[in-house]
Amino acid sequence: QEVYDGQALYDVWNTYTFAIEKEYPSHHSNVYYHGEVNSMEMDLNVDVLAGKNKEEEHISELSRNYDDFYITTLSRTDNKLYAGKLVLSYPLAGGRISGGSEYSYTHRTSDFSGFGDEIEGTSDKIREKNLAFFLDCVYRLGGVNASAGLRYEDVYYDFYENSLYQSDESKHYRNLFPSLSLEGAMGQVQWALGYHIQVARPHYEQLKNAIHYGNRFTYLGGAPNLQPTYIHAAEMRAIYRDLQLSVGYNRYNDDILFSIEQITSCLLYTS
């Protein structure tokens, strides 16, 4: 790999990476029930999931003009998930109404050894509790199929660094997510309209403090203070014989993007 400083050749690197990844047996338990009582359908789903993995990485970065780098890192991750969902559905006035609740609890710990004197090691813990209630209605109004829904979420996200609670990175969200769709036909043209709001939460890998080594000038790290992305989506579709027209609009609030920052103040990099 050739590295340039402006137009001048700065250095030439040969990088070798050897990784040993051990994934321990995961444990998954599920309880499911489906039944019907007086025309009311009931679905109950409960899951328990636990797993952990360990990765050891050896990096040799050989330089033509400067010192060689030899780096060994060790990372461990432990995950536990408890989740349950209950849905009740009942026919009502020519349509159907369904509602229910779901709850999930996630406990995740990740430890990272760091890179010797170059990058500091980290020890993170995440606890997330998500409680949701939802209601959906489906009706046929004349020649139009209509459905509407509303979902409420109450999320607690607690972040710990080196066993200390971090109030700035911990979050509490309360959100409503509506949805609406209409489908029908005008002559030989079938049409559909839809609108909904959804959320895309950061992956845990994007939230942890551990730093991934690219080369001696490039590090990749997470950001515990990342916010969820809220997506407003609207769509219109029309079909006539073999022709299909689709128009969509999406608006992203707090979208997650990669950013590049230059570090010049010190050799030890912490996230």
Which sequence ranges carry the predicted segments?
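Short beta-strand-initiation
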Residues: 26-28, 83, 132, 177, ...
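Feature captures outer-membrane beta-barrel proteins of Gram-negative bacteria and organelles
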Residues: 176-182, 234-238, 245-249
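Face-selective signature of the C-terminal outer-membrane beta-barrel domain
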Residues: 1, 17-161, 185, 189-190, ...
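Outer-membrane beta-barrel translocator domains and adjoining extracellular loop/strand segments
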Residues: 1-14, 54-65, 109-118, 158-166, ...
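Conserved small/polar residues in nucleotide/adenosyl-binding loops
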Residues: 269-270
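Surface-exposed extracellular loop regions of Gram-negative outer-membrane beta-barrel proteins
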Residues: 154-159, 187-234, 247-266
